Amino acid sequence: MTPKEIVAYLDSYIIGQNEAKKAVAIALRNRYRRMQLDKEVQEEITPKNILMIGSTGVGKTEIARRMAKMMGLPFVKVEASKYTEVGFVGRDVESMVRDLVLASVNLVENEHRQKAQAQINDYIIEKITQKLLPPLPSGASEAKKNEYEISFAKMKQKVIKGEVDDLMIEIDISKKAPMGDDNLPPDMIKVQESIFKVLNVTQDKIKKEMSVREAKEALMYEATESVLDAESIRAEGLRRAEQNGVIFIDEIDKVAISNKDSSRQDPSKEGVQRDLLPIVEGSVVNTKYGQIKTDYILFIAAGAFHVSKPSDLIPELQGRFPLRVELSTLDEESLYQILTQTKSSLLRQYQLLLETENIRLEFSDEAIRELARLSHNANQRTEDIGARRLHTTIEHVLEDISFNVDEYQGKEIEVNAEMVREALADLVENVDLARYIL
């Protein structure tokens, strides 16, 4: 997709913020351009990381997430404030790269599973049919074998059509490997895997009695393991994470040290920034799937920078984010457009939810404008949380309908401006109340 097409796609989900959309679209297109070059030149070209500056709820995370989802890219969102300097108790910054690799491997595995779904289903059907019709003894006659094949084919069709779903069978189920901690150091991960192997040697499978319907679900793990090539999935997952991965680091401002308040800052904040440097610049990180170079991962950092400034980050880290975009706060018109012009808007979501209760919900244009106006006022009078304020205001307006569904079933309800004002009157007028409820 061209940068214009990417921005057009993002426009259907995010209102405004054109500068941020352009920066992300160009960064994404540059990856495609890089892949068209010779290998030697490719190695010299690294992504230009982006720093987004803007208050909460203006679309920073959504831009990156929508972009990654649209292109099928490995993507993780992390909070910088959750990490600690090496030597302190907590997660080290390398764990974000391990999270990315895990997300990438899962993405590739899902793609392979979808492509091999027919084979997986065949494996499951075959296993269940064999349990329902045990194989003939080795010395059976040709006539018996032919008769068995006909019966087997008929039974297989019954399993496929679900005609025998309620029959009880005893099957051998492969035990799932225990879930380990991917954020341990590489040496400890190897020790952990060795322990799991020893624990699994004694009993690879367990016998369980269940219905055919339940067996179809229970055999899914075994069928997937049997059909899919785990090694190729691992290699492809590593490659994609390395070449196409996107790491979104939120709350980067929380690890910046303000000059005004440096005496009271957490001493580990600068340590986290210094630990981030080699990851963002390019280094090799060990994961349980293998080593990954971080040179070509696109890092997008974001923060509100209310207390600190981007210049409060250590100079070396500032240099690793050469592209800076400032996202504007959302005004009343922007909030109105979010409610009316975005795909899967909040209003549409509530309409679909209440349709399941046989309630038809409509919003007048005046009501939508009133929702936008009151949400904007609440943002100005208390903390500005951007579009997230709409969730709270709409929830308050629809609270009575959502709770008393039995009274409204089979009816068509139009929400007008007066209903919106009545529902939010006390909260909007009382600043202290709005601060805690809105």
Tell what function each PLM region has:
Residues M1-L438:
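Non-catalytic accessory segments flanking P-loop/AAA+ NTPase cores
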